[in-house]
């Protein structure tokens, strides 16, 4: 049996990979729980979201203050407690003040730096490696 943290089924988590294509950068945010670690904007799907893409877009706005267009489904990665769904978000607008701006920092970084910073969380690193911003093999 997996660790579902008291849930009967794994939590559905929707993640955005915010990309600024002209610069080839990805936007990371700090965790609210641990200010020294970096993550991709992500959070639980809510029934009011409707589709998973809407949840990923909402989380990007709440956690990172970015608006844009979901352009690509990247992957789904199951873990013991959650099922992660990753989407690329082409950023169109960066809000100067956003819902979690007092709780998080955000920073544009290149692919290699992003991979280094989120490598502690295998699901995030795997998804970034499958994104269109990853170097072609």
Where are these regions (language model features)?
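Eukaryotic N-terminal low-complexity, Ser/Thr- and Lys/Arg-rich leader segments
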Residues: 1, 135-137
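A short coil-to-beta-strand element that immediately follows conserved catalytic motifs
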Residues: 65-77
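Short, well-ordered beta-strand micro-motif
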Residues: 18, 30, 86-90
């Amino acid at each position: 049996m997996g660790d579902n943290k008291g849930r009967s089924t794994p939590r559905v988590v929707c993640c955005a990979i915010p990309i600024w294509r002209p610069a080839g950068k990805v936007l990371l945010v700090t965790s609210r729980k641990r200010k020294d670690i970096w993550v991709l904007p992500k959070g639980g799907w809510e029934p009011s979201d409707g589709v998973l893409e809407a949840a990923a877009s909402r989380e990007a706005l709440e956690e990172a203050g970015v608006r844009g267009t979901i352009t690509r489904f990247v992957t789904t990665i199951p873990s013991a407690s959650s099922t992660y769904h990753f989407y690329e978000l082409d950023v169109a607008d960066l809000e100067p003040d956003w819902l979690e701006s007092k709780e998080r920092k955000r920073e544009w970084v290149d692919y290699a730096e992003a991979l280094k910073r989120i490598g502690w969380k295998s699901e995030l690193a795997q998804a970034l490696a499958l994104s269109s911003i990853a170097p072609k093999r």
